[in-house]
UniProtKB/Swiss-Prot annotation:
NAD(+) binds at Y132, Q194, N217. Keywords: Amino-acid biosynthesis, Histidine biosynthesis, Metal-binding, NAD, Oxidoreductase, Zinc. GO terms for biological process: L-histidine biosynthetic process. Its EC number is 1.1.1.23. This is Histidinol dehydrogenase. One of its GO terms (molecular function) is histidinol dehydrogenase activity. Catalyzes the sequential NAD-dependent oxidations of L-histidinol to L-histidinaldehyde and then to L-histidine.
Length: 439
């Protein structure tokens, strides 16, 4: 087989032990203790000094001198100057995301569990939400849409965005335009752990939020986990999102160029990104065409350096059959799963663990990343085995009610008295007895 400048290491599944398979599917290891020691002092500084600390961090990290670290709505039109074409593109994406997330709203449910006993579940929007929009290696208005639109659909009364400024001290106008469109009340000019702390604890003029959303690097993720575990913050987070990742399953019917670019589109996100390709019964010629396409496209792309670094932690595995491919995929639990398979949709029932799935030759990850309507804020680092991606539900909380009639408590009361006494909780039992229930 030819050698290429950029080549993903490849293996045959049949030649691997269970331990070797585990090693190949391992994510890049992060030194969490070291990250925490960096993040915690920043969080404490923001708690104690508020906006002044954000101004100092902007000077330190972005090399920008800010007079204020907050933009308040209504936002000046000059801050939202974007081309008509980009405005139209954002509006199309907004509408698709809005349509899909609106369909997720659920009516109040009411169930009579037995005669005289009615239980309900109703939703309420989270009052104050904070949306973190990264800005390190790329401007990400798409993330502003993915977080802002479901917040609007859910009806969250107070929305705050936090995003780092550009080199000139301004926020990308696309993000300001989206902030205005979703009804955000403020934009905090900060990135990293300091942004998470500002939203979790509040700063002058911007009260603390109840829940924080948004992807980010290892420092952002560590900060989110820290504030979630701080009872003084009383703040929830969406999910522990880490580096971008994709797993592609491809058979002989695939287009090598499409496979290569689906892989590279995630590799270009960051140095810690990871890509995995599982090939099913590929001929040597088709396998080489994919490797060549990866090399050729990677060398010409603007973020070639990042891709080269990410590929060092990536792998191609030649599996024996489709069932084995899905066994590997479910073990890995990818953020993005792409199916370059004949009759791809027929394999959806085999998927147990994945953030979002891209089915067939016409469904690149890019569509979900920007505008198909699904959400691109997804669980990574294996959390797809226990977490879902961001949805409208993420911005809602559910409250249950129960209402009993006199007949209902007489029917159900004896059961509750006996169960309460079994647990030794006599006040529970007496709260039923005092209402006239007797065994």
């Amino acid at each position: 087989m030819p050698e290429y400048e950029i080549q993903v290491p490849s293996y045959r599944a049949a030649a691997l032990t269970a331990e070797e398979r585990t090693r190949l599917l391992a994510r890049p290891i992060q030194n969490t203790q070291k990250i925490r020691t960096i993040v915690q002092p920043i969080i404490e500084d923001v708690k104690s000094r508020g906006e002044a600390s954000l101004i100092d961090y902007a000077s330190k990290f972005e090399k920008v001198q800010l007079k204020s670290a907050v933009l308040k709505a209504p936002f000046d039109d000059d801050l939202m100057k974007i081309s008509p074409m980009i405005k139209e593109d954002i509006d199309i994406a907004f509408n698709n995301i809005f349509a899909f997330h609106s369909s997720q709203l659920r009516p109040t449910i009411a169930v009579q569990t037995m005669r005289g006993v009615v239980c309900q579940r109703m939703s309420r929007p989270i009052n104050r939400v904070g949306l973190y929009i990264p800005g390190g290696t790329a401007v990400l208005p798409s993330t502003a849409l993915m977080l802002g639109v479901p917040a609007k659909v859910a009806g969250c009364p107070h929305v705050v965005i936090s995003t780092p400024v550009r080199k000139d001290g301004t926020v990308a106008p696309e993000i300001v335009y989206i902030a205005n469109k979703i009804g955000a009340e403020a934009i905090i000019l900060a990135g990293g752990a300091q942004a998470i702390a500002a939203m979790a604890y509040g700063i002058s003029g911007v009260p603390k939020v109840n829940k924080i959303f948004g992807p980010g690097n290892q420092f952002v993720t560590a900060a989110k986990m820290h504030v979630q575990n701080d009872y003084g913050a009383l703040v929830a987070i969406d999910l522990p999102a880490g580096p971008s990742e994709v797993l592609v399953i491809a058979d002989e019917t695939c287009n090598p160029e499409s496979v290569a670019l689906d892989l590279l589109s995630q590799a270009e996100h960051g140095l810690d990104s990871q890509i995995i390709l599982l090939t099913v019964s590929l001929s040597p010629e088709m396998f080489d065409r994919i490797q060549k396409a990866i090399n050729d496209h990677a060398l010409r792309l603007s973020r070639s350096y990042i891709i080269k670094h990410a590929i060092k932690k990536s792998v191609i595995v030649q599996v024996d059959n489709v069932d084995q491919a899905f066994e590997w995929s479910n073990l890995y639990g990818p953020e993005h799963l792409v199916l370059h398979l004949k009759n791809a949709s027929s394999y959806i029932p085999k998927i147990d663990n994945a953030g979002s799935v891209f089915v067939g030759p016409w469904s690149p990850v890019s569509m979900g990343d920007y505008a198909s309507g699904t959400n691109h804020t997804l669980p990574t680092y294996g959390y797809a085995s226990s977490y879902s991606g961001v949805s409208t539900d993420s911005f809602l909380k559910y409250i249950t009610t129960q209402e009993l009639t006199e007949e209902g408590i007489q029917r159900l009361g004896p059961t509750v008295i006996r169960l309460a006494e079994l647990e030794g909780l006599t006040a529970h039992a007496d709260a039923v007895r005092v209402r006239g229930v007797r065994l």
